[in-house]
Amino acid sequence: MKLLEQIEKWAIETPDQTAFVWRDAKITYKQLKEDSDALAHWISSEYPDDRSPIMVYGHMQPEMIINFLGCVKAGHAYIPVDLSIPADRVQRIAENSGAKLLLSGTEVTVTDLPVRIVSEDNLKDIFFTHKGNTPNPEHAVKGDENFYIIYTSGSTGNPKGVQITYNCLVSFTKWAVEDFNLQTGQVFLNQAPFSFDLSVMDIYPSLVTGGTLWAIDKDMIARPKDLFASLEQSDIQVWTSTPSFAEMCLMEASFSESMLPNMKTFLFCGEVLPNEVARKLIERFPKATIMNTYGPTEATVAVTGIHVTEEVLDQYKSLPVGYCKSDCRLLIMKEDGTIAPDGEKGEIVIVGPSVSVGYLGSPELTEKAFTMIDGERAYKTGDAGYVENGLLFYNGRLDFQIKLHGYRMELEEIEHHLRACSYVEGAVIVPIKKGEKYDYLLAVVVPGEHSFEKEFKLTSAIKKELNERLPNYMIPRKFMYQSSIPMTPNGKVDRKKLLSEVTA
């Protein structure tokens, strides 16, 4: 697959087809090509001998997609930076990346950045004055050159720049289009901010198939009335999000086939897909295919996938995350560095062309997480799991296991069983510390329909069900009830916010 050529062919075949929609703003494939060509021509003329990455700042504006393509056509990787990212972090990204230029279709509120800023009217002037100019195709990003760099949280407190090459992205996009049976001209949900690599799962599969990206922003998500009004107008056919976001939508009774009659495919990544969430989706959208996928940012979005059917739901209480894409392989490594046999838990290691070339400007971190196995790049995920007959089962983060009163446990396992209880719509487990040790577990619960007059009676009923599924030491000591679970801008459960709320 020639990625950029595949996107550009739609400017010729379907020039007036909408490529991207955000609120009242939209761009066609013709405009996407013309403006990204103009921008690439300007970048090449301004920085003829430079290939440093370029920061692209904003939140869901159509100009961001134009800027992404303009950067790579000129031979520069882009760094997506969402408006929600704190100024201090933006500053550290600018310093770590060595970027010299920041592009934005909106006002840049961060000050004192060590980069040249081109935003709003200046960007539009470039589109206008360089219109009709085409960049030299030899300058475009290719092969093992970086296509984009996404910054993720680092254990040291400093963000890590994950370098994803052109070849990495091509491998992912080709697999996604083929394995998920994506069709020409479909409408894709774009829920994840561009600084979160889940967005790559909708951006490039949509653009290479001549589809339309329908973006919903964080303000819509915070106002359910606006969110569902937008969804009703969208005619979305391919849904890409975290499971938490879909679970939130399922709390609205009208979120069903009647709202989105042409829904064909649900693609989930970024979190564990609870069995009960998948089951509700099958009930609400009986004609749609549900795909559960797995992969870290360091392995280009996702490397495994499985079609979740009723048979799969009945067979597995904790859903598998799928079979590995054909050009990669999975190894389960034991603590002693040997490969675990089928069915035995260990650390998930991903090998193959989806694996990043490492962290930008951080050789020590790269050496710690990445290695070479049989001549191929490999990434040690820090995730626990096992493989049975080629099917991967994810068992949470190795560092998401806690020791409570001498017992080692996985919080996600408790959450899984809690969500399966009657009267529970959503739930998160928060471990509470006393000094340096964990003291007890708190369950934050979004209750479902029930007839209990007092909260303690509801808690007793839930605990009774949990006692049938979990040992006593894994039963939460305290329960707190909320109308919703807070989420990060990326659509994941905001565990830090929850912890600050319950310990305040």
Curated annotation (Swiss-Prot):
Keywords: ATP-binding, Cytoplasm, Ligase, Nucleotide-binding. The keyword rRNA-binding does not apply. GO terms for biological process: lipoteichoic acid biosynthetic process. Its EC number is 6.2.1.54. Its main location: cytoplasm. It comes from the Bacteria. It is an enzyme of class 6 (ligase). SUPFAM superfamilies: Acetyl-CoA synthetase-like. The keyword DNA repair does not apply. CDD domains: DltA. D-alanine binds at residues 197, 301, 492. InterPro entries: AA_adenyl_dom, AMP-bd_C, AMP-bd_C_sf, AMP-binding_CS, AMP-dep_synth/lig_dom, ANL_N_sf, DltA, DltA-like. PROSITE patterns: AMP_BINDING. GO terms for molecular function: ATP binding; D-alanine [D-alanyl carrier protein] ligase activity. GO terms for cellular component: cytoplasm. It is found in: Cytoplasm. It catalyses: holo-[D-alanyl-carrier protein] + D-alanine + ATP = D-alanyl-[D-alanyl-carrier protein] + AMP + diphosphate. NCBIfam families: AA-adenyl-dom, D-ala-DACP-lig, PRK04813.1. Catalyzes the first step in the D-alanylation of lipoteichoic acid (LTA), the activation of D-alanine and its transfer onto the D-alanyl carrier protein (Dcp) DltC. In an ATP-dependent two-step reaction, forms a high energy D-alanyl-AMP intermediate, followed by transfer of the D-alanyl residue as a thiol ester to the phosphopantheinyl prosthetic group of the Dcp. D-alanylation of LTA plays an important role in modulating the properties of the cell wall in Gram-positive bacteria, influencing the net charge of the cell wall. Belongs to the ATP-dependent AMP-binding enzyme family. DltA subfamily. This is D-alanine--D-alanyl carrier protein ligase. It comes from Bacillus cereus (strain ATCC 10987 / NRS 248). The lineage of its organism: Bacteria, Bacillati, Bacillota, Bacilli, Bacillales. The gene is dltA.
